[in-house]
């Protein structure tokens, strides 16, 4: 075996045999070691090319390894032949592979033995090899040593000191930099070698076309012990390298797959996003189209509903009730159906109550009394010209029509049935009664007479509510004359009117029906007693004229008479059904028929209208709550009504009112009546007025001229109105007989001073209305100083003097230019159509009062255009009053409006308005003031008057040297700006909060009709006291100036000469011109506390000034009403 190994080693180191192509050349002849070596080299070449060994070569190689036995057993010849055969097999190599496959099966037993022999050889080599390192390890060790040496040298060079010579230092630095460039050098060398190899090997690809087997990895030959440990280590390294490359390739592939999946995932997301982006506009477009379609459908539906509403509204205005009801059914509007059903129930209930009223007498007849002719329905049916329709009886044709008609059509038929029920007995009036001698009735007055006669025939009562100035008095006289002439109803009739208009009633009876016995029941108790003794015994009268006061005072006498007709002029006096007058007339007097005359049936609310209806028909309109709920219930929670619902409510209410209320307007019946134009003239305030206005709004008190003491005020709204009128209203003892100061201290007086001379020169006559009688006194002083001819009528004017005053003013070529009237006393029932200009000095919270005053001139008989001037202080509380008045006028224009159902307007809102006025203070005073030219344009009725007014203004400016027209701050007396700290000391036990929102007690005035039950118990002896007797003496100021009566002050100033700065002003001596002028100590405001419903918009809760102390005012009375409650 050792010989074999040595032979193999010798073969390895021996020079290789020449190989030509793929053929192994084995020499013949001698055999021996050279031949074996050549055989082994050929086999090695085949194995290196990864080619299978031919069986002969395999057998020869095996025989070489098995050596002696094989070779010795077979003999020398046999061995040479086998070697030659192996060499030939190797030479035939690839070409005769087929034959090798066939021979391999025969040599398989020897092959197994060869494999075993090679394994044993390898084990022996591994066992006997000494300690050594592989080539790769040696190379790595060498590299490590080399790198360590270089690193050591770098450290050594870096640590060398710099004190060496220059040459040595340079060499060390060069060596150091060279060593540091080692890595760069390796990289450059590697790159250059790679480039060189690529250029060399790949420059000519066509030359590299050879057997691809040569490109395979050359493994070192280690079979059969040929090779060394270095070859095996290299094989191990290559194997590990291939494994790591495979692992890297797998990782790279997995990474690529993950990247692919990731990209695919994000690609899917992006694709989904792109699809979503494409779908969103499409979806939005589809949604928009759908929404547009829905919106267009709703628009078309709303347009269709609006068209139907407009059509229904037009049909409702036209009065086509059947068509309207059919359209309501088609629209399926539940709100309208509910409203129709509720109001239909009201109309049916009223119709039944009316029928019951007609069947019975309104008031039980006293024993022994006889019915007047024509008073019963059965008797009236026999009168020629009467048409009787029983609501319970219907013709067969009507029954058939009702049978075929729908039940819903009764909603509107209820209104017709109510009208026909009330006026089922009709009597045509074609001519006026012959007893009327004063003139001819107008057509609309004949219609009014026929309407009142229809109520009489049907045993019902009513309200004649014609607009003021249309002759309600004449129509009433015509009714009495007709009843006397045609029905033989001689009375007696009771006519109740305000005291101011009693002379007018008496004059109208004398003028139009002198044959009717009329008594004016007024005067002192003795006079009235004489009238009763003379006329009541034999009943030598037909009509008794009296006023509200005597109805209560002479109750025990007047209630004994069985009155046939009760006629109440200015019937809105009964707008409170709980007042003493209404309760007394209903419960204590015996009355068969009732008739109310009023030009303003609705002043503030639906409650007032019900009160009037309740007075005339208490059995029908017996519940105020039900009356309001009938119209309020359908929309108790929804107060906003559209135009159609509001008009329907108005229409249905008209159906309720139409049978009992007749109202005509001037523009409807009097087409030739001159127009009435209202002009609002705004004026500024003087510095004095602004000072007082600011004091009232800031601390609720004003400074007086008596010892520089201020005074706490009550009823702030009234105090602010006084500030707007004139500052003299606060300083009672101030010397007002100064010609210039009385004008310059008030903006309204300054405007009046410019306006009155122009109106007088233009030939106009003026009615001037004010609510404050004390202001009328100041106006009197002004008119006397400037020598204007005037008259005055207020609550203190006696009844017998009022007729004379009216006659003197209305007579032809009367010398009187101006008539001073109080709004409350002079605005009712007076005929002053000879004047064509009305000046409202201060507006009332209730616009109807101003309307009544305006219509004193704008009435039948007026031939000139009527101009109404309303004076308003800019930025003050008067603008709020004007705005509220405009809102209230809408109630009368529509008779009823949605605001009447609105119960949210409470006292809190009114209190908030007062607080807003006080908070605003004087910030808006004096803004938006018209110029003189604008005022002239508003006041002039034509261009000629305008240029006349312009000329008069220029003359006045030149005469006054262009001085300021209003008082400036430096001209105001110093005591006006006195500090409030100088007020009187207040006891410690008095409360510190002063109630400022209270109102004064109602003072006694002649026209006043707000009397309670105490008048029924009053003794007649009280009447013996003069009416103008002085009242309880007020506490005087704590100053040297004593309280003096105005008449005494006039006497003291009778010979006073005006010593003003202007020397051109002549001497003036006051004269008492007007008739019936009372002393100056009368009430400063005849009715500054208004009726309950219109007291003031600012009423409704206490408003206190905490910075003030309570101080008993010597200027006003106590601030609580008769029930002890504070009121504003």
Curated annotation (Swiss-Prot):
Which Gene Ontology terms of cellular component type are present?
chromatin; nucleus
Q: Which EC class heads this enzyme's classification?
A: hydrolase
The record's keywords, sorted A to Z, are: ATP-binding, Chromatin regulator, Developmental protein, Growth regulation, Helicase, Hydrolase, Nucleotide-binding, Nucleus
In the UniProt record, the gene name given for this protein reads CHR719
Its protein name is Probable ATP-dependent DNA helicase CHR719
Helicase C-terminal domain location is 751-912
Ranges of compositional bias, category Acidic residues: 1084-1093
Q: Which SUPFAM superfamilies did the record assign?
A: P-loop containing nucleoside triphosphate hydrolases (SSF52540)
Q: Segment Disordered: which positions?
A: 91-110, 353-415, 1076-1097
The signal peptide annotation in the UniProt record is: none
Assembly and oligomerization: Interacts with LFR.
Origin organism of this chain? Oryza sativa subsp. japonica (Rice)
What's a BP term from Gene Ontology annotated to this protein?
positive regulation of transcription by RNA polymerase II
The listed location of motif DEAH box is 569-572
Q: Name the Gene Ontology molecular function terms of this record.
A: ATP binding; chromatin binding; DNA binding; helicase activity; histone binding; hydrolase activity; nucleosome array spacer activity
Functional description taken from the UniProt entry: Probable chromatin-remodeling factor involved in root and shoot stem cell initiation, and root apical meristem (RAM) and shoot apical meristem (SAM) maintenance.
Q: Where does the UniProt annotation locate this protein?
A: Nucleus
Q: What residues does ATP bind to?
A: 466-473
State if Nucleotide-binding is listed as a keyword. Answer: yes
EC numbers on record: 3.6.4.12
As its record notes, the protein acts as a catalyst of: ATP + H2O = ADP + phosphate + H(+)
Q: Which domain of life is it from?
A: Eukaryota
Helicase ATP-binding domain mapped to chain residues: 453-619
Q: What residue spans carry the Basic and acidic residues bias annotation?
A: 356-376, 400-415
Q: Has the keyword Disulfide bond been applied to this entry?
A: no
InterPro entries, per the entry: Helicase_ATP-bd (IPR014001), Helicase_C-like (IPR001650), P-loop_NTPase (IPR027417), SnAC (IPR029295), SNF2-like_sf (IPR038718), SNF2/RAD54-like_C (IPR049730), SNF2_N (IPR000330)
Q: Which family does it belong to?
A: Belongs to the helicase family.
């Amino acid at each position: 075996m050792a010989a074999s190994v040595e032979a193999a080693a010798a073969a390895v180191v021996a020079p290789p045999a020449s190989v030509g192509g793929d053929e192994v050349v084995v020499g013949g002849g001698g055999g021996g070691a050279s031949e074996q070596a050549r055989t082994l080299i050929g086999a090695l070449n085949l194995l290196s090319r990864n080619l299978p060994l031919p069986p002969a070569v395999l057998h020869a190689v095996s025989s070489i390894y098995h050596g002696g036995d094989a070779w010795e057993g077979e003999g020398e010849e046999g061995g040479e032949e086998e070697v030659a055969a192996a060499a030939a097999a190797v030479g035939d190599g690839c070409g005769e592979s087929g034959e090798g496959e066939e021979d391999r099966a025969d040599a398989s037993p020897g092959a197994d033995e060869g494999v075993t022999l090679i394994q044993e050889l390898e084990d022996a080599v591994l066992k006997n090899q000494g300690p050594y390192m592989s080539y790769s390890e040696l190379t790595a060790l060498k590299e490590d040593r080399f790198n360590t040496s270089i690193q050591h040298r770098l450290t050594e060079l870096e640590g060398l000191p710099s004190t060496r010579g220059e040459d040595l230092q340079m060499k060390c630095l060069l060596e150091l930099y060279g060593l540091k460039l080692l890595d760069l050098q390796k990289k450059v060398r590697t790159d250059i070698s790679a480039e060189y190899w690529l250029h060399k090997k790949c420059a000519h690809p066509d030359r590299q076309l050879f057997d691809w087997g040569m490109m395979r990895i050359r493994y070192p030959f280690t079979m059969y012990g040929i090779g060394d440990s270095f070859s095996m280590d290299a094989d191990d390294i290559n194997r590990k390298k291939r494994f790591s490359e495979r692992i890297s390739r797998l990782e790279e592939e997995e990474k690529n797959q993950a990247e692919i999946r990731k990209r695919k995932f994000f690609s899917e997301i992006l694709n989904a996003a792109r699809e979503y982006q494409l779908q969103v506009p499409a979806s939005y477009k589809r949604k928009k189209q759908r929404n547009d379609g829905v919106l267009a459908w709703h628009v078309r539906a709303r347009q269709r509903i609006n068209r139907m509403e407009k059509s229904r509204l037009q049909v409702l205005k036209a009065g086509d009730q059947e068509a309207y009801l059919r359209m309501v059914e088609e629209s399926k509007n539940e709100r309208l159906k509910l409203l129709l059903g509720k109001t239909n129930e009201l109309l049916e209930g009223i119709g039944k109550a009316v029928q019951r009223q007609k069947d019975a007498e309104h008031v039980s007849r006293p024993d022994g009394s006889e019915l007047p002719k024509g008073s019963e329905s059965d008797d009236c049916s026999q009168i020629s010209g009467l048409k009787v329709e029983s609501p319970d009886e219907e013709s067969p044709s009507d029954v058939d029509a009702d049978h075929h008609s729908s039940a819903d059509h009764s909603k509107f038929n209820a209104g017709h049935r109510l009208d026909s029920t009330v006026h089922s007995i009709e009597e045509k009036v074609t001519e006026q009664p012959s007893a009327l001698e004063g003139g001819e009735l107008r057509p609309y007055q004949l219609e009014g007479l026929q309407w009142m006669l229809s109520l009489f025939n049907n045993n019902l009562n009513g309200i004649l509510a014609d607009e003021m100035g249309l002759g309600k008095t004449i129509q009433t006289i015509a009714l009495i004359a007709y009843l006397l002439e045609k029905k033989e109803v001689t009375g007696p009739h009771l006519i109740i009117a305000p005291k101011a208009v009693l002379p007018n009633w008496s004059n109208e009876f004398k003028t139009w029906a002198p044959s009717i016995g009329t008594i004016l029941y007024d005067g002192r108790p003795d006079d009235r007693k004489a009238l009763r003794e003379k006329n009541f015994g034999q009943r030598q009268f037909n009509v008794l004229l009296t006023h509200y006061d005597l109805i209560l005072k002479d109750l025990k006498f007047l209630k004994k008479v069985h009155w046939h007709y009760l006629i109440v002029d200015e019937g809105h006096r009964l707008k409170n059904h709980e007042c003493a007058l209404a309760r007394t007339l209903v419960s204590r007097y015996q009355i068969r028929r009732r008739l109310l005359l009023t030009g303003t049936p609705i002043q503030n609310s639906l409650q007032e209208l019900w009160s009037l209806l309740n007075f005339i028909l208490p059995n029908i309109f017996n519940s105020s709550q039900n009356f309001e709920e009938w119209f309020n219930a359908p929309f108790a929670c929804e107060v906003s009504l559209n135009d159609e619902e509001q008009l329907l409510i108005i229409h249905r209410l008209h159906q309720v009112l139409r049978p009992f209320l007749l109202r005509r307007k001037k523009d409807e019946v009097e087409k030739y009546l001159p127009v009435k134009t209202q002009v609002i003239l705004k004026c500024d305030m003087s510095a004095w007025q602004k000072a007082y206005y600011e004091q009232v709004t800031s601390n609720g008190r004003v400074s007086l001229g008596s010892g520089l003491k201020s005074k706490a005020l009550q009823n702030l709204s009234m105090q602010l109105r006084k500030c707007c009128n004139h500052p003299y209203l606060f300083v009672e003892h101030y010397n007002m007989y100064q010609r210039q100061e009385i004008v310059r201290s008030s903006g309204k007086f300054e405007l009046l001073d410019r306006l009155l001379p122009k109106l007088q020169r233009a030939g106009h006559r003026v009615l001037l209305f004010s609510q404050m009688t004390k202001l009328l006194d100041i106006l009197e002083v002004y008119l006397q100083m400037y020598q204007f001819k005037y008259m005055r009528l207020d609550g203190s004017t006696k009844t017998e003097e009022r007729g004379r005053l009216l006659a003197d003013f209305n007579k032809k070529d009367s010398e009187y230019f101006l008539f001073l009237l109080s709004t409350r006393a002079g605005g009712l029932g007076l005929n002053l159509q000879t004047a064509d200009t009305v000046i409202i000095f201060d507006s009332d919270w209730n616009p109807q009062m101003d309307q009544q005053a305006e219509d004193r001139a704008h009435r039948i008989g007026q031939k000139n255009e009527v101009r109404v001037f309303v004076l308003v202080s800019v930025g003050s509380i008067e603008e709020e009053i004007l705005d509220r008045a405009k809102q209230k006028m809408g109630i009368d224009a529509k008779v009823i409006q949605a605001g009447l159902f609105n119960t949210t307007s409470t006292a809190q809102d009114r209190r908030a308005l007062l607080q807003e006025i006080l908070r605003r203070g004087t910030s808006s005073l004096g803004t938006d003031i018209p110029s003189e030219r604008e005022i002239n344009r508003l006041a002039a009725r034509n261009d000629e008057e305008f240029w006349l007014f312009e000329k008069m203004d220029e003359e006045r400016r030149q005469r006054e040297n262009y001085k300021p027209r209003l008082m400036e701050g430096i001209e105001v007396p110093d005591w006006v700006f006195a500090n409030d700290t100088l007020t009187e000391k207040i006891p410690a036990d008095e409360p510190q909060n002063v109630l400022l929102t209270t109102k004064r007690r109602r003072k006694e005035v002649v026209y006043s009709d707000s009397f309670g039950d105490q008048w029924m118990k009053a003794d007649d002896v009280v009447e013996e006291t003069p009416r103008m007797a002085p009242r309880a003496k007020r506490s005087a100021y704590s100053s040297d100036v004593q309280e003096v009566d105005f008449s005494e002050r006039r006497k003291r100033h009778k010979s006073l000469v005006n010593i003003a700065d202007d020397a051109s002003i002549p001497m003036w001596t006051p004269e008492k011109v007007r008739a019936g002028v009372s002393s100056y100590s009368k009430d400063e405001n005849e009715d500054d506390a208004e009726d309950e419903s219109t007291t003031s918009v600012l009423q409704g809760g206490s408003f206190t000034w905490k910075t003030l102390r309570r101080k008993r005012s010597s200027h006003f009375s106590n601030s609580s009403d008769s029930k002890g409650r504070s009121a504003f």
